[in-house]
Amino acid sequence: MLEIKDLHKSFGSHEVLKGLDLSVQQGDVVAVLGPSGSGKTTLLRCLNFLETAQSGTMNFDGDLFNLKYITKKEISSVRKKTAFVFQNYNLFRNKTALQNVTEGLIIARKLPKKEALEKGMYALDKVGLSAKYDAYPHQLSGGQQQRVAIARALASDPEIIYFDEPTSALDPTLIGEVLSVMRKLAEEGMTMLVVTHEMNFARNVSNKVIFMMDGEIIETKTAKDFFNNPEQACIKAFLRTYLNNDEGSQSYELRRVNEEV
């Protein structure tokens, strides 16, 4: 479905992504983990063309693109199949929940208003917010705002959704409602690439984990193998730090990791 090869991205003289290779199959839920500053968000932004890569190729549904020389028309064709959920919601403050969900459908996709409204209400219902269709962002909690953002992504019928730390801006008491929606999407077969520090989500919902450090992917494993059989010392240290702060009990294997580091 999605394959990236030799992705490079620099800001000035600082190389942020150092020749990344990755693949995502239909139905995959891929957790992108790693310490702050490892390039996780930049990776997502390059995949959705919010940043321009210096080099690399993308194969999306059999169509091959050179990421350095990709055209606006090609970008548009890929974006029609993708959606992006930002960590800070990025909602229009002066528009209702439904208007936020349908804005892109009407303006960018040129859908008839009636069809856009139907899609918008269906998407809001999927995230449990159909009753809040006429509420403005300031009338919603942070968790509800992020669910509106997810509904906006769903309304475009994407093949894959990119999530950039979707719970990092939320009060801890609101994180669960967003993760619950994401878990439901995973169960329904939605393909997702998720930058997150929510270890329980990565362990229990994702089927694949990518671990990044200093602009490189240093490990790609199934979620089970990543959490139960970490091999590199830096990954063991990372898990020890974040699992001690994550909610829920740890398995025997995860406790063993903490003891070994």
Segments (PLM) and residue ranges:
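A short, proline-enriched helix->beta-strand linker immediately N-terminal to the Walker B motif
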Residues: 155-159
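Catalytic Walker B motif of ABC-type/P-loop ATPase nucleotide-binding domains
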Residues: 161-164
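ABC ATPase NBD coupling module
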Residues: 65-83, 113-114, 229-230
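Conserved ABC ATPase signature
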Residues: 136-140, 144
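Helix-to-loop junction immediately C-terminal to a conserved catalytic motif
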Residues: 48
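Conserved ABC transporter NBD signature motif
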Residues: 56-66
